[in-house]
Amino acid sequence: MQIQSFYHSASLKTQEAFKSLQKTLYNGMQILSGQGKAPAKAPDARPEIIVLREPGATWGNYLQHQKTSNHSLHNLYNLQRDLLTVAATVLGKQDPVLTSMANQMELAKVKADRPATKQEEAAAKALKKNLIELIAARTQQQNGLPAKEAHRFAAVAFRDAQVKQLNNQPWQTIKNTLTHNGHHYTNTQLPAAEMKIGAKDIFPSAYEGKGVCSWDTKNIHHANNLWMSTVSVHEDGKDKTLFCGIRHGVLSPYHEKDPLLRQAGAENKAKEVLAAALFSKPELLNRALEGEAVSLKLVSVGLLTASNIFGKEGTMVEDQMRAWQSLTQPGKMIHLKIRNKDGDLQTVKIKPDVAAFNVGVNELALKLGFGLKASDSYNAEALHQLLGNDLRPEARPGGWVGEWLAQYPDNYEVVNTLARQIKDIWKNNQHHKDGGEPYKLAQRLAMLAHEIDAVPAWNCKSGKDRTGMMDSEIKRELISFHQTHMLSAPGSLPDSGGQKIFQKVLLNSGNLEIQKQNTGGAGNKVMKNLSPEVLNLSYQKRVGDENIWQSVKGISSLITS
């Protein structure tokens, strides 16, 4: 839809919408319209200009020193600038209204970052809504649409433009390091666009350096927010991988209304997860490319709340489980297209075996009990695959774990301990409560999968918040185990040393960068303060530092989908 120039034909309502938006933006920046007066420098303002993405710079290094404020003004500027860019995509790059706003923002830039005021935070949160209202008012005036229809058009147009902007930005490998007790650990998040054997990514529908953000909820061709997550330690002059797994958004393209297309899309996403899992096993991938039909074991851990009372995640879980079931019938072999080192598509044959779990980890599941019964109906079957039919804690493990232990591997004790912990959790329904550790079952399932040479994969709805916290919990426990050679007891809070590890992981795992990649702002929505307090999960106790907790929360509360 072509929208003509605003100034010569604007209706009164359109003018009012613009003035409201202008007031919100300008007041949020604490400048006077037309004067470009910069905000006064706060007493605790840091003197340097903050520049992220410079060589060696990470969100962790930056946020770790943000002791004086919940939100950085620079972060709010960046978020608002991105939203104006999206609006300009809808209204036109030369739109005089948005150009005026952008110019005012340039004038309002400060030379040093400082804590944002509550007024600035409110303005940043309201800007998206106000931009949509401006687009709606202009659309209504130009096309004579009813107000509701114009607003619906504006919301869809803005969302589509925002998704396109997020998808088309470069999706690149994120690599951060942390040091604890003299050991150097590297956290690597490798996006689908950089899962390459040669010059191109391995997927038949190439990513070409781009990605699929968590808000692209109708995409039936690609998995959302697909990454390979690795943590390694440098010792004896070389890097040793402690853990490698695949993370992603839910397999359901849940805003696709056609049930056949939605299921086809879920299966396409599942195939991409399998391709990524194969990529994470270079030796197995080479055998497949040489023509061998290879077996691939994958432990999928969904983190959704399997209920439709809030958010329809129950239906999403059903879509995901149906996709796994369709691809993993007993004895079934599937053919995947993989782009080889020469850039040519090659068919590989795999026999996938997927143990598909779903473990609710949010307040709805762990505080109110939503979705637990539905999830456990899937979990019982998956546990039998993983641990055999006898799930008594004292019983010898069967299933995949029993097969692994029969080889008397070097990690026999670790595998046996993790298996026993999982069976204890299951027997006592500890995964139904926070109990000081919301991810107690999910995290141990992923760790056990890695230890028995299966591929761990995990996801929530978006692949960034609960998925990111799972990623951090796994890495916290792995680094702690590497240092102490002891696994934490289920439901235990980290001690002071464990909290220090967790704090470093939360800020340097790459998860803040992934959240920014998907939404335009870094911050994890898992971190929240609810009322009454009894509804809150145990993350303030687990993190042990209010400033770190706020840094991990970031500007997530200001971002709306």
Swiss-Prot record:
InterPro entries given in the database record: IpgD/SopB
An annotated GO cellular component: extracellular region
Span(s) of short sequence motif CX5R motif: 460-466
Gene3D superfamilies named in the record: Cell division control protein 42 homolog
Enzyme Commission (EC) number: 3.1.3.-
UniProt function note: Converts phosphatidylinositol 3,4,5-trisphosphate (PtdIns 3,4,5-P3) to PtdIns 3-P and prevents the transition of PtdIns 3-P to PtdIns 3,5-P2. It is one of the known effectors injected by Salmonella into the host cell and is required for invasion and for an efficient generation and maintenance of Salmonella-containing vacuole (SVC). Alteration of the phosphoinositide composition of the plasma membrane causes membrane ruffling and actin cytoskeleton rearrangements.
Gene this chain is encoded by: sopB
Record keywords, A-Z: Hydrolase, Secreted, Virulence
Molecular-function GO terms, alphabetical: phosphatase activity
Name of protein: Inositol phosphate phosphatase SopB
Family: Belongs to the phosphatase IpgD/SopB family.
Enzyme class name: hydrolase
Record has Hydrolase as a keyword: yes
UniProt-annotated catalytic positions: C460
NCBIfam families listed in its UniProt record: PRK15378.1 (NF011905)
Primary location: secreted
Subcellular locations according to the entry: Secreted
Swiss-Prot/TrEMBL domain comment: Contains the consensus sequence Cys-X(5)-Arg characteristic of Mg-independent phosphatases.
Organism, scientific name: Salmonella typhi
